[in-house]
């Protein structure tokens, strides 16, 4: 996901550079502002994904502990 976002950001920067020859300064400034906004959004999404990773790992750990407790109970009953 991060690589895809970098490619998109690179395409936006490249596109704005190519358009610089036939654009006014106001349009260039607007594109630059848009790129900065997109960069901030990409960074926020990356932070959100990283936060979710730790939550997912915690949920996996809880599920593994619950499954182990169930396995232990079944083993005792069958014993």
Curated annotation (Swiss-Prot):
Bilayer topology term: Lipid-anchor; Peptidoglycan-anchor
GO biological process, one term: lipid modification
Lipidation (N-palmitoyl cysteine): 22
Sequence repeat extents: 25-35, 39-49
Knocked-out gene: effects: The integrity of the cell envelope in a lpp null mutant (double-knockout) is not affected.
Span of the signal peptide: 1-21
A single MF term (Gene Ontology): peptidoglycan binding
SUPFAM superfamilies xref list: Outer membrane lipoprotein
GO terms for cellular component: cell outer membrane; extracellular region
InterPro entries reported in the protein's UniProt record: Lipoprotein_leucine-zipper_dom, MOM_Lpp
N6-murein peptidoglycan lysine, modified sites: 79
Any coiled-coil regions, as ranges: 28-69
Predominant location category: membrane
PANTHER family referenced in this protein's UniProt entry, alphabetically: MAJOR OUTER MEMBRANE LIPOPROTEIN LPP (PTHR38763:SF1), MAJOR OUTER MEMBRANE PROLIPOPROTEIN LPP (PTHR38763)
Subunit structure, interactors included: Homotrimer.
Family of this protein: Belongs to the Lpp family.
Function description: Plays an important role in virulence. A highly abundant outer membrane lipoprotein that controls the distance between the inner and outer membranes. The only protein known to be covalently linked to the peptidoglycan network (PGN). Also non-covalently binds the PGN. The link between the cell outer membrane and PGN contributes to maintenance of the structural and functional integrity of the cell envelope, and maintains the correct distance between the PGN and the outer membrane.
Protein's UniProt name: Major outer membrane lipoprotein Lpp 2
Organism: Salmonella typhimurium (strain LT2 / SGSC1412 / ATCC 700720)
Annotated gene: lpp2
């Amino acid at each position: 996901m991060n690589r895809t976002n970098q490619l998109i950001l690179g395409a936006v920067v490249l596109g704005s550079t190519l358009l610089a020859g036939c654009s006014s300064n106001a349009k260039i400034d607007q594109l630059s502002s848009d790129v900065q906004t997109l960069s901030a959004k990409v960074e926020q999404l990356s932070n959100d994904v990283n936060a979710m990773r730790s939550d997912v790992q915690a949920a996996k750990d809880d599920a593994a502990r619950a499954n182990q407790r169930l396995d232990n109970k079944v083993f005792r009953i069958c014993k």
